[in-house]
């Protein structure tokens, strides 16, 4: 299990490497308080605007180097979040419903 100090550090790193106004949300098993022995961390990073979400995800994932855990970093623009937040079954809906904000 990954301790809260490490999770908070990851949130700070992701927020610090992102544009102003970015929100970092932890979701998945750690946010629900149900991590298993092999659980990774799942982050939704909501940026004001995103040109290429895949490239930004890779760039942000690199900021977590040195923290010894597996992580998924999903990047979405504020507009994409608005478009998908009410669509049940979507990743964005689930992340917002179960997640907790680490950094804003």
Spell out what each predicted region is.
Residues 39-41:
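Short, conserved active-site loops that position catalytic residues or coordinate cofactors/metal ions
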Residues 44-46:
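Short hydrophobic/aromatic beta-strand micro-patches
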Residues 1-23, 32-37, 48-104:
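Catalytic core of pol beta-like nucleotidyltransferases
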Residues 29:
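Conserved H-loop
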């Amino acid at each position: 299990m990954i301790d809260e100090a490490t999770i908070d550090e990851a949130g700070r790193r992701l927020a610090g490497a992102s544009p102003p106004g970015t929100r970092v949300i932890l979701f998945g098993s750690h946010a629900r308080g149900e991590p298993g022995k092999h659980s990774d961390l799942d982050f939704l990073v909501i940026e004001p605007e995103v040109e290429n979400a895949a490239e930004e995800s890779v760039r942000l994932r690199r900021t977590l180097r040195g923290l010894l855990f597996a992580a998924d970093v999903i990047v979405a623009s504020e507009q994409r979040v608005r478009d998908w937040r009410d669509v049940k079954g979507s990743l964005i809906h689930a992340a917002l419903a179960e997640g907790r904000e680490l950094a804003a």
